[in-house]
Design a protein with these regions (language model features):
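Mature catalytic domains of secreted/periplasmic carbohydrate-active enzymes
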Residues: 2-442
């Protein structure tokens, strides 16, 4: 599969979909992801660490992803199983679907917070690995949020609010796993069986076609992979799915988690799969915390603060990628307070310094550093130095690319002088990085 692979092979049948990456996506810099489902009711996982930092032989039993609760609660000896037995008496997972009310959910309120970050696109989960769909998906026999639980078309509400807020709308769909459709044992190791049969491939195909028909998403964000039986061309194949998508949404994009088939951009996750963060268009995704789904065990020590998130955003953009930052809604539909605080902090920063990331590209001739923390981006003939250090800072410019007489902090000119192959600027104290901009001499 293409996910995390450094040299995936695009089969001949999928070469027809190769095209330049649309500028709206390339310049977006920031997208916001939302994970929300029945797993938001228990909202429980061990906050063990980031994907890529937790040993693989411990990952599944001690999974920090709360959205994996339906799997982790079935693993013998896992803390999630012990928690489930103690708190819920071993009740079936679908009890959480019926207990999920979304009583405080207002899509417009959520999107107002999202839009204030400056994000260019928004992607909610439509079906995660538990198989519950957040719209009235075909052949789900009522196991969806229209017939049970919230009794609402949550995807339709998200789509309308996203477009009203001026953002591009995407949909996440887990094609690689469905713990309800297929009666398979819990996943407790890499390489565990996953649904690959034709029945599931056609079921998933019909779901995504329905999402395209109803909501015209700008982004198809698949996960894990696609069932093997659906890869070869055919009437309900992934080839047909992509043909349908691009015919309806010509400037749409898809990620690389559809098996070894087609992608418009590569993805990494937390600190896993970072080898793909070169060359091609790419996107790093992670939660504000250690989980994508809301996890009641997470505290501020497990979450990105606003300054942390800003540094991550700038770092990703300075290397040519987009950041897809996730929030996990509470079961009620509220954004958790600590996650909201981070989003609001991002918005405050982008209101002042967003010109250094939105529509920006790397400036490879300038060198990043950790001391002081410094990243470089470029928009047109302007180069931006994003600095996280107060006081007098020396910005290395040995080749004289920058015109120091044009130094600006936002719209305000600032003093700058050249000395010993560097430009010296004075930076006021602040909680988050600042962007100093220069006209390039090239």
């Amino acid at each position: 599969m293409a996910m995390f692979e450094t040299d995936p092979v695009r089969p001949e049948a999928y070469r027809q979909f190769e095209k330049p990456l649309p500028e709206w996506f390339r310049g977006a810099a920031l997208g916001i992801f939302v994970h929300w489902g029945p797993y938001s009711v228990p909202a429980w996982a061990e906050p063990t660490g980031e994907l890529g930092a937790v040993p693989r032989d411990e990952w599944y039993t001690h999974n920090p992803y709360a959205e994996w609760y339906a799997n982790t609660m079935r693993i013998e000896g896992s803390p999630s199983r012990a928690h489930h037995e103690a708190v819920y008496g071993g009740a079936p997972y679908d009890d959480f679907l019926d207990a999920w009310e979304a009583e405080e959910f207002d899509a417009a309120e959520v999107l107002a917070v999202v839009a204030a970050t400056g994000a260019g696109y928004f992607i909610p989960t439509t079906k995660h690995h538990d198989g519950v769909t957040l719209w009235d998906a075909p052949a789900t026999d009522g196991r969806n949020t229209v017939a049970r639980g919230p009794r609402r078309d949550l995807i339709g509400e998200f789509a309308d609010a996203t477009r009203a807020a001026g953002l591009r709308f995407g949909v996440y769909y887990s094609g690689g796993l469905d713990w309800h459709f297929s009666d398979l044992p819990p996943i407790d190791h890499d390489g565990a069986p996953a649904p690959d049969d034709l029945a599931y491939a056609e079921y998933a195909h019909d779901h995504v076609i329905d999402l395209i028909d109803r909501y015209r998403p700008d982004i198809l964000w698949g996960d894990i992979r696609w069932p093997a039986a659906g890869i070869e061309p055919g009437p309900k194949s992934l080839v047909h799915l992509f043909e349908t998508f691009y015919s309806r949404v010509p400037d749409g994009v898809v990620n690389d988690r559809w098996g070894e088939s087609h992608w418009d951009f590569r993805t990494s996750e937390y600190v896993h799969g970072t080898a793909v963060e070169v060359g091609e268009a790419w996107e790093n995704t992670r939660g504000i915390g250690l989980s994508f789904g809301h996890n009641r065990n997470e505290t501020s020590e497990h979450l990105l603060s606003a300054p942390d998130a800003v540094r991550l955003l700038v770092d990703v953009v300075s290397r040519g990628g987009n950041l897809l930052l996730n929030i996990g809604l509470e079961a009620s539909g509220r954004i958790p307070d600590l996650q909201r605080k981070t989003l609001e902090g991002i918005g405050e920063w982008t209101a002042r310094h967003g010109h250094a990331v939105f529509g920006a590209a790397p400036e490879p001739r300038m060198q990043a550093s950790e001391g002081p923390w410094l990243r470089w981006t470029r928009t047109g003939d302007t180069v931006h130095a994003v600095i996280d250090q107060e006081g007098r800072v020396a910005l290395p410019d040995p080749d004289g690319l920058l015109d120091e007489s044009t130094a600006r902090l936002g719209e305000q000119p600032i003093a700058a002088e050249r000395a010993d192959g560097a430009i010296l600027v004075d930076v006021a104290a602040g909680a988050t990085p600042v962007a100093v901009s220069f006209r390039a001499r090239d």
